[in-house]
Regions:
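Histidine/cysteine-enriched polar flanking segments
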Residues: 1-136
Length: 136
């Protein structure tokens, strides 16, 4: 389950020193952190995966074998829809970019409450739903 931990993805913006410092800070708040490598071709760890529920991750194929996902169900984005992995879960609802029809259909078929939102404008700067949110 991801309910008891935070995954910190390394990237051009987050180096190991920063991730280690954040992990130490999270520990003072009673949260366990794990540092993950972001594979080449994935801009940021969180743009390549999103939480469907506490035990299920939507991920691009490049993150399918991420060690931090051990014990979780990993659902891969449909072919050609890698940006759809940048979902945002709010309680039991998953927000998905409205242009990712195959992903929306796949999640809906799993019984997930899916809300499509327009993301075309934010996608122009390589951003998605998680980039436009503040959450804990």
């Amino acid at each position: 389950s991801l309910a008891d931990r935070v995954i910190i993805g390394l990237s051009d913006r987050t180096d190991r020193a920063g991730a280690t410092e954040l992990a130490a800070l999270l520990e003072t708040l009673g949260r366990r952190a794990e540092i993950a490598e972001t594979p080449p071709g994935v801009l940021h760890f969180k743009t390549g995966c999103g939480l469907i529920d506490e035990n299920t991750i939507l991920a691009v194929p490049e993150l399918a074998s991420c060690p931090q996902f051990a014990g979780l169900e990993v659902v891969l984005t449909p072919l050609g829809e890698n940006p759809a992995a940048n979902i945002l879960r709010v309680r039991d609802t998953v927000l998905v970019g409205d242009r990712w029809r195959a992903t929306r259909a796949m999640l809906t078929a799993r019984g997930i409450d899916v809300r499509p939102l327009p993301t075309d404008q934010i996608a122009r700067i390589d951003a998605g739903l998680s980039c436009m949110s503040l959450r804990w």
